Amino acid sequence: MNKQQQTALNMSRFIKSQSLTLLEKLDALDADEQATMCERLHELAEELQNSIQTHFEAQYGIGVEQP
């Protein structure tokens, strides 16, 4: 995997991680509507990360290392 592809995968992991952190903060603030939106954002971030990883694995025929 080249550097740009690794960067894209790392960015997707970061977005997933940060959306979960935001969800926890919104839950603590009892911001239910926003927490629901953020939960969907986190689910989409997870789907995106999995899609990117699968794409690169298929492209190169190798596994992508997990951090």
Language model segments and positions:
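Short, charge-rich amphipathic interface segments used for partner binding and complex assembly
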Residues: 3, 11-65
